[in-house]
Amino acid sequence: MDKIGVLLMNLGGPERITDVGPFLYNLFSDPEIIRTPFPVFQKPLAWLISTLRSTTSQQAYLSIGGGSPIRRITEQQARELQSKLRDKGLNATTYIAMRYWHPFTESAIADMKADGIDQVVVIPLYPHFSISTSGSSFRELKKLRDADDEFKRVPMRCVRSWFSQSGYLKSMVELISEQISLCELPSKAHIFFTAHGVPKSYVEEAGDPYKQQIEDCSLLIINELEKCLGHTNPHTLSYQSRVGPVEWLKPYTEEVLADLGRSNVNDLIVVPISFVGEHIETLQEIDIEYKEIAEKAGIKNFRRVKALNTHPTFIEGLSDLVISCLEGPQVNLEEASKLPEKVKLYPQEKWQWGWNNSSEVWNGRVAMIIFLVLFIELISGSGPLHKLGIL
């Protein structure tokens, strides 16, 4: 019987406060997250941003216990998925590849080679595909695989996105239903989907399918929820976690919360639709920041649906996903990592420079100006930032 390796790809997160700076550096070193006009500037810019953001981010992690639980939860998901697959007769072993913190993709590849895996199934723990999440992880895996003659020979099948998978939808409905049942008037409870945002240019200029998949997913969940409950609840979709000067997908979560408060919504069921495990965006951003905004807006009952974590229906769904990937049409790593044909952002292989209206280009220009100003002041020891007391 073939030895199957199931590779679960995720973001990763700092486990201790001292990890926050290096984690942010890794994050912003990824050109799929922030893009500069010349690759030589990528790492200096990542250092600048991670240095400026480190203190604020450390405070956020301190508010949830001093570190991210994402590795612990992902390891629990991997163990339970492995057990479920073996119960179904597969000789499967699960591995974890984090994009920006330990255990990195290189570590997972080394473990699979050492274990003599015969074929690999790759599952990104992002239900919805985006250039900056699954896309970045697939491209990193492809780069490492292409450079490894031994690992390159191992057959590999990939799942690009899985937001419409029945087990995922069913588990979301079960968790949402639990919170709705706590409301005095369940049919009046407002379901508030909040998804991690991406820059608007990723969708409009680069053809990222993320926004469409999020919208389709929220409607699928609402339809399944109606079948389960026998009524349709009012619902809204918004996007959170935006950073930087460029425009991100709208509507923004904090603005919608204020609008719902003005509309006299009393029972709010907050659904973190793009997160399969608890981490900083659920535990701090939603549970602390957005809850405070909602309460100030007059929303009386703020109920947040738990992330999927190791919910039994979700783990069952993941096992079905692995089996269907093995039995269905093959999607190889080349296809999974391929960006949409429409791409206008600068691909990693073709760094260009030009005067056009791309917000990503302007983001790069502004970032370069900030970096040069900071660099000059650090060298000279004087300038406007020193006068303002920033340096």
Swiss-Prot record:
Keywords: Cytoplasm, Heme biosynthesis, Iron, Lyase, Metal-binding, Porphyrin biosynthesis. It is found in: Cytoplasm. Fe cation binds at H196, E281. Pathway: Porphyrin-containing compound metabolism; protoheme biosynthesis; protoheme from protoporphyrin-IX: step 1/1. It is an enzyme of class 4 (lyase). It catalyses: heme b + 2 H(+) = protoporphyrin IX + Fe(2+). GO terms for molecular function: ferrochelatase activity; metal ion binding. PROSITE patterns: FERROCHELATASE. GO terms for cellular component: cytoplasm. Its EC number is 4.98.1.1. Catalyzes the ferrous insertion into protoporphyrin IX. Belongs to the ferrochelatase family. This is Ferrochelatase. It comes from Prochlorococcus marinus (strain AS9601). The gene is hemH.
